[in-house]
A protein has these predicted regions:
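Conserved AdoMet/S-adenosylmethionine-binding subsite of the radical SAM
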Residues: 139-150, 155-253
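Auxiliary Fe-S-binding modules of radical SAM enzymes
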Residues: 1-87, 238-277
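A short loop-to-beta-strand scaffold at the N-terminal edge of the catalytic core in hydrolase folds
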Residues: 88-93
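Canonical Radical SAM [4Fe-4S] cluster-binding loop centered on the CxxxCxxC motif
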Residues: 95-132
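Conserved alpha-helical substructure of the radical SAM core
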Residues: 121-150
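Feature marks short, surface-exposed loop/turn motifs that line or immediately flank catalytic pockets
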Residues: 33, 97, 215-219
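Residues at alpha-helix caps and immediate loop-helix transition turns in enzyme cores, especially N-
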Residues: 129, 162-166, 259
């Protein structure tokens, strides 16, 4: 069965053309899916014949709430979703004065091996499809009744280890016929996968890149974050600089301020010791 919600509007138009339908139907189907339709039977402006064709060849992803916890302190809601294959992921909805931010997962599990992260214990099970990332935003908004204005890819998984599906998700959630959440309202957090950062820079998107350091020196970082053994922090700073040059968007991080100064001072000391200008 085809995962129709992971299709772009253009792909959907071509798919419907192959089914013998006019391509303008794609916009109708796309709109229904991005409003949270769980069944083709809900798509009342489609013919019964077309709905039957789609039901016979396509599936609509939709997660089920396993657990929902809401903080009485600040209204934060934590969701545990069950996907259609039985795997589970987490999503968190946070309230701020500037709007509602949803933190979504990009994979089932993670293979990055960071010592402080529980989601990597069982390793990476599989990547999430674009539709499954979109569903977290869409169904969190529908279930909570709160309009989502910002997205953070900082949940389970390393987004740049699933870069193609993440890129497609970004296009879907940003689409004017969908949820239309602006790129400047989206942040992507990475532990430092440099090829992924460079790939992202080539897309010239206006999202914010958030880099997790978690250590004030490269030796400590390598001990708690295996990714640093492959892509050390000096290379990471250089990749972030190239990202800024390509996009004009700074790279940030929840833990970057405290560690970054120490790391930069260390880099400067090493340069001075080597006699570099």
């Amino acid at each position: 069965m085809v995962d129709i919600k992971s299709m772009t509007l253009e792909e959907m138009g071509e798919y419907l053309r192959q089914l013998g339908e006019p391509t303008f139907r794609a916009k109708q189907v796309f709109s229904w899916l991005h409003q949270g339709a769980r069944s083709f039977d809900e798509m009342s402006n489609l013919s019964k014949a077309l709905r039957a064709k789609l039901a016979a060849t396509c599936r609509i992803t939709a997660p089920t709430v396993v657990r929902k916890q809401e903080s009485r302190l600040d209204g934060t809601i934590k969701y545990l979703w069950e996907l259609q294959d039985g795997n589970c992921i987490e999503t968190v909805l946070m309230q701020y004065h500037h709007g509602n931010t949803v933190c979504i997962s990009s994979q089932v599990g993670c293979r990055m091996g960071c010592a402080f992260c529980a989601s990597t214990i069982a390793g990476r099970v599989r990547d999430l499809a674009p539709s499954e990332m979109l569903d977290q935003v869409l169904f969190t908004q529908m279930d909570s009744g709160r309009e989502i204005s910002n997205i953070v890819l900082m949940g389970i998984g390393e987004p740049l280890d699933n870069r193609d599906n993440v890129l497609k998700f970004l296009g879907l959630v940003n689409h004017p016929d969908g949820m239309h959440i602006g790129m400047r309202h989206i942040s992507l957090s990475t532990c430092g996968v440099i090829p992924g950062i460079e790939f992202l820079a080539q897309q010239h998107l206006q999202l914010t890149l958030s880099v997790s350091l978690h250590a004030p020196d490269s030796e400590t970082r390598s001990r708690i974050m295996p990714v640093n053994r492959k892509y050390d922090v000096e290379e990471l700073f250089a990749a972030c600089h190239r990202y800024f040059q390509a996009t004009g968007r700074r790279s940030l991080g929840g833990d970057i301020d405290a560690s970054c100064g120490q790391l930069r001072r260390k880099a400067m000391e090493e340069k001075e010791g080597a006699g570099e200008p």
